[in-house]
């Protein structure tokens, strides 16, 4: 493989600097950092790009409210973002800002080319616009539409729930439909382009098949942005401006395109699921129009949610990553983000879950294994790691095989962006190694001089597995591995490189261990949970709200309750109900039968999030039709502040089990 073939280009979305970043933003960037570090350790020439999308009406309005220029406003926030990435040890290679000349100059060239070749034309537009989302919607897409007779006169954004306004203005349009067939052919020829797979079906069925309308790509209602060449009253809109960052950052369209030629097309764009459409429909079509290669993969991850839905200052549930890092250390946060949630799915942050991960995984499992190993080597062999010999005890080969299999699992998971799976595999090795200590009982072997060779083998195997564990953790954790290596006396980088994982037992005999402080101290659960909750409450606006008392429900008898039949059901599949933004058509497995239920949870759960979930279903309701679809029951959910959360069941309860 040539050096050129070993390049790897990974990007995050460029973040919108409208306020302070929270743990959700950190999630994407830490994931990108883990992937970049992994590829770098494998010998790839890695280029990791992040940055900020700094133009638009929302930025201009915020700046006006604060009586500062838009540039001064974004400069201040961007400084904070860079400080956060430094604190999180993000190893990005470039930070692109859309207000930089290197970006703006090329965006003007791109827009002019698209106009000159007829892909962009001037016309007039009328549509429902959300300033918060900087997105236009059709009246059929609006949530809670306000009607006057048969006419829609208002409503809310389906993405953020903010109010929309009817906007009529002159605009430049991109001929999207011209490239639809070519885009679908690209999907067919590149089946792994959109990940997870379910996102591809969503793009095709929800956006392309209904008909891809021409896209408004300029605005005249604000002036904070890149001007349209030759028509300066128009500002180039976000679709062309922001998305182009992935190539402008590489020098595309300049006199020096060396970086562009080396790294484009991107190996993977990491994006949140809310911007999949822009990266898998608009961006590929723009690139097709420019006759440029398309990125190899777009990976759409889920959201870090709270128990009461999305993070929001008004709810007092925003988690500031800086607070967690300052109190618990960087590795605790990085580990939690990448371990807790499968990367393509939504996950829920809870203070309890965060502290449990630290105590059980980091302190108990990994920390104790390191402490016990170093202490025993110090006690039984004067702190010197014995020479590695194979198959001295009956348990040695099993442990070595387990370690080799773990490496394969980790590498396979990383190639699929399955960070949680990779970390789970590493922790299975840690658990297996703790079991190896119980099996070999070194404290018993130490009592008999005839077992000296076995004791030495156990110590060498423990040190070796810890070496391998530390190396495999290096993409994820940036502090603990070096502490592990220091306690194991490993100072030669040849023994801590990814390539050294293929050599079992490469620690030189006599390497001196050094006892140290626990790398992850145990936490007091109650104290730390209370602390995190208090910090989250502090994020809420200081406004006293009087909570209305909920009316008490009418009391029923136990006989009334027993009339309701509740059973465990597993979601087999789900899909949107046509012309009904809030409804999902859900197929359930009730053990002895399959049923269809229509539920108003589409705003809170995507179809792919539901698949495989165990839910509670009311099974003896009279079937009804909702929007033309038969509903044969009802799934239970709780509601708080307008956010629905499904009642769920442990996975080990069989489908169809009656709830009593």
Swiss-Prot record:
<dbReference type="InterPro" id="IPR033911">
    <property type="entry name" value="MetRS_core"/>
</dbReference>
<dbReference type="InterPro" id="IPR023457">
    <property type="entry name" value="Met-tRNA_synth_2"/>
</dbReference>
<feature type="short sequence motif" description="'HIGH' region">
    <location>
        <begin position="15"/>
        <end position="25"/>
    </location>
</feature>
<keyword id="KW-0067">ATP-binding</keyword>
<comment type="subunit">
    <text>Homodimer.</text>
</comment>
<dbReference type="InterPro" id="IPR004495">
    <property type="entry name" value="Met-tRNA-synth_bsu_C"/>
</dbReference>
<dbReference type="InterPro" id="IPR012340">
    <property type="entry name" value="NA-bd_OB-fold"/>
</dbReference>
<dbReference type="InterPro" id="IPR014729">
    <property type="entry name" value="Rossmann-like_a/b/a_fold"/>
</dbReference>
<protein>
    <recommendedName>
        <fullName>Methionine--tRNA ligase 1</fullName>
        <ecNumber>6.1.1.10</ecNumber>
    </recommendedName>
</protein>
<dbReference type="GO" id="GO:0005737">
    <property type="term" value="C:cytoplasm"/>
</dbReference>
<dbReference type="GO" id="GO:0006431">
    <property type="term" value="P:methionyl-tRNA aminoacylation"/>
</dbReference>
<dbReference type="InterPro" id="IPR009080">
    <property type="entry name" value="tRNAsynth_Ia_anticodon-bd"/>
</dbReference>
<comment type="function">
    <text>Is required not only for elongation of protein synthesis but also for the initiation of all mRNA translation through initiator tRNA(fMet) aminoacylation.</text>
</comment>
<dbReference type="Pfam" id="PF09334">
    <property type="entry name" value="tRNA-synt_1g"/>
</dbReference>
<keyword id="KW-0694">RNA-binding</keyword>
<dbReference type="InterPro" id="IPR041872">
    <property type="entry name" value="Anticodon_Met"/>
</dbReference>
<keyword id="KW-0820">tRNA-binding</keyword>
<keyword id="KW-0547">Nucleotide-binding</keyword>
<dbReference type="GO" id="GO:0004825">
    <property type="term" value="F:methionine-tRNA ligase activity"/>
</dbReference>
<feature type="short sequence motif" description="'KMSKS' region">
    <location>
        <begin position="310"/>
        <end position="314"/>
    </location>
</feature>
<feature type="binding site">
    <location>
        <position position="313"/>
    </location>
    <ligand>
        <name>ATP</name>
    </ligand>
</feature>
<keyword id="KW-0648">Protein biosynthesis</keyword>
<keyword id="KW-0963">Cytoplasm</keyword>
<dbReference type="InterPro" id="IPR015413">
    <property type="entry name" value="Methionyl/Leucyl_tRNA_Synth"/>
</dbReference>
<dbReference type="InterPro" id="IPR014758">
    <property type="entry name" value="Met-tRNA_synth"/>
</dbReference>
<dbReference type="InterPro" id="IPR002547">
    <property type="entry name" value="tRNA-bd_dom"/>
</dbReference>
<dbReference type="GO" id="GO:0005524">
    <property type="term" value="F:ATP binding"/>
</dbReference>
<keyword id="KW-0030">Aminoacyl-tRNA synthetase</keyword>
<feature type="domain" description="tRNA-binding">
    <location>
        <begin position="560"/>
        <end position="660"/>
    </location>
</feature>
<dbReference type="Pfam" id="PF01588">
    <property type="entry name" value="tRNA_bind"/>
</dbReference>
<dbReference type="GO" id="GO:0000049">
    <property type="term" value="F:tRNA binding"/>
</dbReference>
<dbReference type="InterPro" id="IPR001412">
    <property type="entry name" value="aa-tRNA-synth_I_CS"/>
</dbReference>
<dbReference type="Pfam" id="PF19303">
    <property type="entry name" value="Anticodon_3"/>
</dbReference>
<comment type="similarity">
    <text>Belongs to the class-I aminoacyl-tRNA synthetase family. MetG type 2B subfamily.</text>
</comment>
<keyword id="KW-0436">Ligase</keyword>
């Amino acid at each position: 493989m040539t050096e050129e073939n070993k390049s790897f280009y990974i990007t995050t979305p460029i973040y919108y600097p409208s306020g302070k970043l929270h743990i959700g933003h950190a999630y994407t960037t830490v994931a990108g950092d883990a992937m970049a570090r992994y590829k770098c350790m494998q010998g790839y020439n890695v280029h990791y790009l992040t940055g900020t999308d700094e133009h638009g009406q929302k930025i201009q309005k915020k700046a006006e409210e604060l009586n500062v220029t838009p540039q001064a406003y974004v400069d201040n926030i961007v400084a904070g973002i860079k400080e956060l990435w430094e604190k999180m040890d993000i190893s990005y290679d470039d930070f692109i800002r859309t207000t930089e000349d290197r970006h703006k100059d090329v965006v003007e060239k791109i827009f002019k080319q698209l106009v000159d070749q007829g892909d962009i034309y001037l016309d007039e537009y009328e549509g429902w616009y959300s300033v918060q989302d900087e997105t236009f919607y059709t009246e059929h897409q609006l949530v809670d539409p306000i009607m006057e007779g048969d006419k829609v006169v208002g409503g809310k954004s389906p993405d953020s729930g903010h109010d929309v306004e009817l906007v009529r203005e002159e605009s430049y349009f991109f001929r999207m439909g011209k490239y639809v067939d070519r885009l679908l052919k690209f999907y067919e020829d590149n089946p792994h382009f959109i990940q997870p797979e379910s996102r591809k079906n969503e793009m095709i069925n929800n956006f392309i098949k209904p008909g891809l309308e021409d896209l408004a790509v300029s605005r005249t209602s604000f002036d904070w942005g890149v001007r349209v060449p030759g028509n300066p009253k128009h500002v180039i809109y976000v679709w062309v401006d922001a998305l182009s960052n992935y190539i402008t950052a590489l020098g595309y369209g300049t006199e020096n395109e060396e970086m562009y030629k080396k790294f484009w097309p991107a190996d993977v764009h990491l994006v949140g699921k809310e911007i999949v459409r822009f990266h898998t429909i608009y961006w590929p079509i723009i690139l097709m129009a420019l006759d440029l290669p398309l990125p190899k993969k777009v990976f759409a991850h889920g959201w870090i949610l709270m128990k009461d839905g999305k993070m929001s200052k008004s709810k007092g549930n925003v988690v500031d990553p800086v607070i967690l890092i300052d109190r618990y250390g960087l590795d605790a946060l990085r580990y939690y983000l990448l371990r807790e949630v499968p990367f393509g799915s939504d996950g829920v942050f809870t203070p309890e879950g965060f502290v449990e991960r630290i105590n059980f995984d980091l302190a108990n499992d990994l920390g104790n294994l390191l402490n016990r190993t170093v202490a025993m080597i110090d006690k039984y062999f004067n702190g010197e790691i014995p020479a590695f010999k194979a198959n001295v005890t009956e348990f040695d080969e099993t442990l070595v095989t387990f370690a080799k299999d773990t490496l394969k699992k980790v590498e396979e998971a990383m190639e699929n962006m399955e960070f949680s799976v990779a970390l789970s595999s590493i922790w299975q090795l840690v658990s297996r190694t703790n079991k190896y200590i119980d099996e070999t009982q070194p404290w018993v072997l130490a009592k008999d001089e005839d077992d000296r060779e076995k004791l030495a083998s156990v110590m060498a195997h423990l040190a070796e597995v810890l070496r391998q564990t530390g190396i495999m953790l290096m993409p994820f954790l940036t502090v603990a591995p070096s502490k592990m290596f220091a306690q194991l006396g490993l100072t030669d980088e040849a023994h801590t490189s990814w390539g050294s994982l293929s050599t079992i037992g490469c620690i030189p005999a006599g390497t001196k261990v050094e006892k140290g402080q626990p790398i992850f101290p145990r936490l007091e659960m109650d104290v730390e949970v209370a602390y995190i909750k208090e910090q989250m409450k502090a994020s809420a606006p200081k406004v006293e709200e009087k909570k209305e008392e909920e009316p008490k429900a009418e009391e029923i008898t136990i006989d009334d309750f027993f009339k309701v039949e509740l059973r465990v059901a597993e979601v087999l599949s789900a899909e949107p109900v046509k012309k009904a933004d809030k409804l999902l058509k859900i197929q359930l497995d009730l053990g002895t039968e399959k049923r269809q239920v229509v539920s108003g949870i589409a705003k809170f759960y995507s179809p792919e999030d539901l698949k495989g979930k165990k839910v509670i279903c009311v099974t003896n309701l009279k079937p009804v039709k909702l929007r033309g679809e038969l509903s044969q029951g009802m799934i239970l959910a709780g509601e708080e502040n307008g956010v629905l959360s499904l009642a769920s069941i442990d996975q080990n309860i069989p489908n169809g089990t009656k709830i009593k």
